[in-house]
Regions:
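Conserved, well-structured interaction surfaces
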Residues: 42-59, 80-149, 169-180, 184-199, ...
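An aromatic- and glycine-enriched ligand-binding surface/loop that stacks and positions planar moieties
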Residues: 23-83, 156, 179, 187-188, ...
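Long, intrinsically disordered, low-complexity segments
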Residues: 93, 103-106, 181, 259-314, ...
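Short coil/turn linking the two alpha-helices of tandem helical-hairpin repeats
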Residues: 146-148, 153, 197, 217-226, ...
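Bacterial Sec-dependent N-terminal signal peptides
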Residues: 1-31
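Flexible, polar/acidic helix-loop-strand segments at domain edges
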Residues: 323-417, 582-583
Length: 583
């Protein structure tokens, strides 16, 4: 979001909406690429004009910030001495820079396309739908910005602010006002959007669901770290989420693992998502997470996720341990296996051309997996199972095209799911009370939990607590870019509790797991001995716990931004956003 530069972004909207990366939150699309005279001439062009917002401007965030900020910082992911793990990240960190660039890029694209859509020569319904999609994505970008940095500038119209020459003179706006701006933006989006849209694209229910989530976060913003959440905001979160649950016609998928399969890319549970395509010539249209998170050799192309591993603390939350004998592991939560691969796990939906995927065989059988990295590399005994598509045959089967040498896939990233909305409702109904016996709140909580654990009964639940709902959110949405933001919004109203959760996490790895896994496999798994030598195979306590302070809940601004706009280091200003801005 470097404010000094006015370089333009090339936008190829007529060729599927590709966008290149940019670094400025006052950037705008290159007007030479298209103009009102040669584009926005009919319904098809108008609908296509928004496609870019589902992919390219988010790419730089996806590559690093999407999993480093919400997953490593939250204690869901382990990655050695990563500064996000020990809270030593600074404004020179590439993930911080890329995240900032990406989110301001989304805002710039949404602003520019929205303004051009006003004069589009298309049917009124198509124009309104496209404009509503723009505003929803803009709101999503600001929702990330305010939860990552807190007080941030508001750039309502890039072109007018560039023309005014204010790009080095932007002041931060108080986070509470930024939240109100997001609410205002989503209210307009809801007004514009229809109740149904093309598969994979945002409709009114998606915007309402996002607004419910925004209200839930906003409810604590004025508590200064210790106080009662705003009851009216909680009521709005409950009202909106219940409306989506009861009236959208959308349902939870029956099997949790199915949500993340390629054939369900645009499933109705995915209310808002990034819709990637490996088919585009612009690599920023493809999903890079399989390369980032899958272990080496998992597919025919590049991947380097061996050392980015599900944390010990997340395994604890699921009730499992890497020291558990695979034959007697007792967890009956189906989300665990769909979230992380552990010793003994097999998957029938990956490597379908080879009869399925076997995790230990992949690690230790070079005939089966010639590209694997010579045994277990993960310090926590597990690897990530979400966001990866399998091998290229699986990609072709799901999408009809090869992932190609670009190493990027067509697998959607679900940014907001219906299950999230169920848990938003349950938490909003609990509100400031700590627990509830409200039947509708328990129903919502139970629907999510029962999908994952089939052998539980509704009559077992007569009360649910806030801690239960927050844990359920962690398990349900693990590796989907969410848990850190649950802790951030907790820090608004109970910062000591948020800090204590992090202080008490097991954020290190294990000693001795490669020897345990290799011996088990080589001695005839699944019937070989599982011999745990507790003197050698144990949780590592030599690395000290990170220094957890109140400051960790906001990232530093990129250093380049601060150099060009010193106002970013000054006190934020109050802005009456409803008086100042309008759509």
């Amino acid at each position: 979001m470097k404010l000094s530069s006015l370089k333009y972004i090339a936008v190829a909207l007529m060729l599927g909406g590709a966008i290149t990366s940019c670094s400025d939150f006052l950037d705008r699309p290159n007007e030479d690429s298209y103009n009102d005279g040669n584009y926005y001439q009919n319904d098809t062009q108008t609908k296509m004009s928004v496609v870019s917002l589902y992919t390219s401007p988010w790419f730089d965030f996806l590559c690093r910030g999407y999993y480093k900020i919400p997953e490593i910082m939250s204690g869901n992911l382990y990655k050695g001495q990563d500064p996000f793990l020990n809270f030593t990240v600074n404004g020179s960190d590439e993930a911080v820079i890329q995240t900032s660039n990406s989110l301001w890029n989304v805002n710039a694209q949404a602003n520019t396309i929205y303004n051009r859509l006003k004069s589009a020569k298309a049917s009124e319904s198509v124009k309104r739908t496209a404009m509503g999609e723009c505003l929803t994505w803009k709101a999503m970008a600001y929702f990330y910005l305010v939860r990552i940095w807190g007080d941030v500038p508001i750039v309502h119209d890039n072109s007018s602010e560039i023309a005014a020459g204010d790009y080095n003179n932007k002041y931060k706006v108080k986070a509470a006002d930024v939240y109100e701006y997001i609410v205002m933006t989503l209210e307009k989006a809801i007004e514009l959007l229809p109740e149904s849209n093309d598969p994979g694209r945002i409709d009114r229910w998606g915007a309402k669901a996002l607004l419910a989530k925004v209200y839930l976060a906003k409810s604590g913003i004025n508590c200064n770290g210790n106080g009662q959440r705003d009851e009216s905001d909680l009521a709005k979160a409950a009202e909106l989420s219940k409306d989506v649950i009861d009236n959208s016609g959308k349902e939870l998928m029956y099997n949790y693992e199915d949500i993340f399969k390629g054939e369900n890319n645009n499933c109705e549970e995915s209310l808002i998502g990034w819709r990637w395509s490996a088919e585009q010539t612009n690599y920023t249209c493809g999903n890079s997470l399989s390369a980032e998170l899958a272990p080496s050799g998992f597919n025919e192309y590049q991947s380097w996720g061996d050392w980015t591993a599900p944390s010990v603390d997340l395994q604890d939350a699921f009730g499992v341990s890497p020291l558990d004998n695979p034959k007697s592991r007792t967890s009956n939560d189906t989300r665990r296996k769909a979230t992380m691969m552990m010793a003994g796990d097999t998957y029938d939906y990956w490597w379908t051309d080879k009869g399925g995927f076997d995790y230990l065989k992949f690690l230790y059988d070079k005939t089966y997996a010639p590209g694997s990295n010579n045994g277990l590399q993960s310090a926590t005994g597990a690897n990530i199972a979400k966001h990866i598509y399998g091998d290229d045959a699986d990609h072709v089967k799901a999408f009809g095209i090869s992932a190609g040498a670009s190493q990027y896939s067509s697998l959607s990233t679900h940014v907001l799911r219906l299950a999230d909305v169920y848990l938003i409702y349950a938490e909003a109904k609990i509100g400031n009370q700590g627990s509830t016996t409200d039947a509708s709140a328990i129903d919502a909580y139970f629907a999510v939990r029962h999908r994952a654990i089939k052998n539980i009964n509704r009559d077992e639940f007569t009360e649910i607590t806030l801690d239960q709902v927050l844990k359920e959110r962690r398990l349900e949405l693990a590796f989907e870019g969410d848990y850190w933001f649950d802790l951030v919004r907790m820090s608004y109203y109970d910062i000591e509790k948020a800090m204590n959760i992090i202080k008490n996490q097991r954020r290190n790895g294990y000693y001795g797991l490669p020897d345990l896994y290799k011996a088990y496999y080589n001695d005839g798994q699944p019937n070989g001995p599982w011999t745990v030598d507790e003197t050698k195979m144990r949780y590592e306590t030599d690395t000290p716990k990170p220094n957890v302070t109140k400051s960790i809940f906001k990232l530093p601004f990129p250093k380049g931004d601060v150099v060009y706009n010193p106002h970013l280091m000054e006190e934020a200003q109050h802005v009456d956003v409803r008086e100042t801005f309008a759509y």
